């Protein structure tokens, strides 16, 4: 069965765990019986660069040669907990992998690492540069990877292709891929969501400033709008995340890490730099009992080694519940310490 929608996680962000937002959308789509596919082009694209021959740049240094020789060994080590017993071995493995990625980026005037993407010619904070990235997808560092990958995706004839744009380090690659899709199929419906997209929408008053390139801008939680677009107006929205469409064993972590969000927005909302307050986002928490139940269910289904609570700040109520009632899986997150 052809998927009605293909959801894409674009490069570049840390490839340590599945993206929480797309996992939540996947859970909603699955609960409503809507065919979908998830493509983590961030993970796939970075692995493509790491395992590809190092571009010739006139520099033939020993570090790059060593990194290339041990690339598979280093990738395996980062997925095996043993290397984390030695800080120096871990640091060397990460440095060697970053060396290969950095050299690949240098050929395109890109400052690239496992966590960042900076183009010396284009900036993600200028709409004109984003449009330029869309107009010239062949100039993107990841083009040799995403061109055939997206060609195959288009052959599945999805009704929509959606991109989850959360960080500035993803913006130029997102628009390059959107531009490629527009070239191959001008009629393909494209949806753009994610936290960075939400911030832009608040600035522009929810106006689609990329009309003609992007069909739909989704600000905030995407479940309701996505179901409406897919003709499921009365579908289930409050559903747990679904990680079964993600290659959970391919991420660069010693154990499977599952991100989980216990609330939308932030319970504190008083930090001077808070985007939730600036954007007028509501605080919509799950009940502690529901959080515990969903975490226990996910633990039984996926057998993760770690749960990452991705809230801006984990609330005292959730902390109390999880310390008194173990979800069965180690967990961590960030919270506010109040004197």
Across the structure, where does each feature detected by a protein language model lie?
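Non-catalytic, alpha-helical, charged scaffold/linker segments
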Residues: 41-111
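A cross-family glycoside hydrolase active-site/sugar-binding cleft signature
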Residues: 8, 39, 164, 191-193, ...
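Flexible loop/turn segments at secondary-structure boundaries
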Residues: 13-16, 45-46, 169-172, 198-200, ...
